[in-house]
Amino acid sequence: MEIEKKRRHTSGRTLLWSVAAIAVIAAAGVVGGKVMLEKTVRTSLEQSGAQAASVEVDFTGHVHLSDVTVPLENDQTLHIASIEARPEFLFLSGMIDARDLAFEAGPMHVSVPSVLIEDAGINRAFLAAASGEADLTPAERVARLSAGRIEIASVAVSQSQQGIDQTTTYSDVALENIVDGHVGRYFASGMTSDTEVAPDPRADGDAEPVSVKLSVGAIEGEDIDAPFLTRIYTEAKPADGENAAQQVYGPVTAKDFVMETADGRVTYAEMSSDGFSMRLADEPFLTTLERLGALSDTEALLPGDEERLGLEAFLLLDAIAKGDLQISGIGLTTDAEPDMTFAIDRLAVTFDDLVLGFSMDGLDVRAGDDSLTVRSASWTDFSLAPTLAGIREYLKAGPGAPDMAWKAAFLPGFGTLSLSDYAVNMNPGAENGFDVEKPLNVAVKDFSLALQDPVNGIPSDIRMVMNELKLDLAGHDDNEAFALLKQLGYQEVNISENIALHWDKANKALIVEDIGFSGDNMGSVSLSGVVGGFGEAFFSGDKALMQAAVFGLTGRAVALKVENDGLFARALKLYADRNGMSVEQAALTLSMLPSIAAQTVGEGDPGVQALIDAVSAFIADPNKLEIAITAKSDQGIGAPAFMAATMDPASLLQQVDITAKAD
């Protein structure tokens, strides 16, 4: 990716300087007169440092040059075999026709057979900007470029660097309605790329080179703000804080994406975007890239430099204000699994001020009779804002490996992850299947996980919901829980779970709203409560501080709700069968257990008696049971009281109120 960024940047500058150099030569025609034109062209060549084997100007104002060499920055050069140009003159519009352009920059070579610029705005204002006579910023110079249409038959870029050989070709490129540097519309008939990565000489064994072939069909787009893009690369955000985002790319589509490797093939039917908006970064992109490039070229980085290098590069994301990408018709095939098919109907990604959204529709993976499917999935409100804020604070603090507190500060805002209609069906011995050792047949109707309101990177509000998890228990006899369910008479289960808790900062409490479980032909269990003494130490990221804070926790309240829908009857029968008694005898035996237990903790206590009566009634006729235990003190019951209760259970009863009922 870094090589691609550098290539695009260098190619962009090459095109700009190429057009500028050609325009300087062509604009000389406005002076008038054949002799005067030739003299002006030669003078312009000398001032720009360009050289030409021949210069001819006809009486119609056309400028003809051959074998032109244009010097560029960093000892790079552009060679043009021939140029025919005409400046704006009377009723004639400007025109440039250049042939056989070649650009060399170290390991990179760019060749363009022809460039035709129609309705080119080649006038004195543009000439001053392009030649450097005017005191303008790079962005202001780009804003002087106007043309009706630019046609480029093809652009071939080849480069070899650090064991990577790459050739990329764009075909039938055209840009239209270029006004003050803004491109109204652009398109290309296609793009192909061949990349070969040499094996790492440090790797063990006989490593093979990696070859990647890429092709893209028709590409169409609108609205490129080239002047503002130039500002992003050459200017830092203003010190006064005014840094409004601007759209730099409008809608764009690309069709028929194909990527092939030795192991398989990935295809997209279409990629599209509604556009991207950006803002100026803390420093110009060019400055950051050059500084990162200098550091990465150093063979021996100082301890921590490599980490800081990656963190600084990560900060570039802050320049992206808003954008999106949609991909449809995704397919994957692999030679390792020739019978496997992988398809996704649609993927979408959104980016809005460091908040990302992701969605997927129609995932379908199959191998023989085995399959994995997901109707839809989404991830919303995933925020990188706290991550970038943490990185800035860490870099400001100076070198040094981050401790746990810093690492916690780097955590992004998780947001909400959701799945719908997830299903896996895999079985051992399936023909052309996934070669699993145990059967796995599971389906989930809905699942969501939300981790919100982070404090120092740690979420303070947690929500998890899973509806209708269906699991076939066949083939899982080695799992104790599954084996017990089968003994209870279940061949498959359909269960749902729910977790909801949040931190009450003002009252230093952890509120457990609900931890629930339910199942078809089973019933449901719901637990809620309040844990006191839950302060900011638990969000510090400091392990020692968090461990010490555990001893300050208190129990304030707990509530239990149980509703039977068949599980208790199955459990009672299993208990009776194991102990050689009838179901009635088993129920009678179990109903006596609460009274026996109460004798050791406080027989005669009103709360205990209510609990005994409710549990006994539930055992006799299992339907609904509700139990609530609340600390008498607003501060709750601390660790010392719980430790004392292990020796004297009755001591705990004096500190709580107990209510219980059975329906």
Name what the model sees in each region:
Residues 2-48:
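N-terminal type II signal-anchor transmembrane helix
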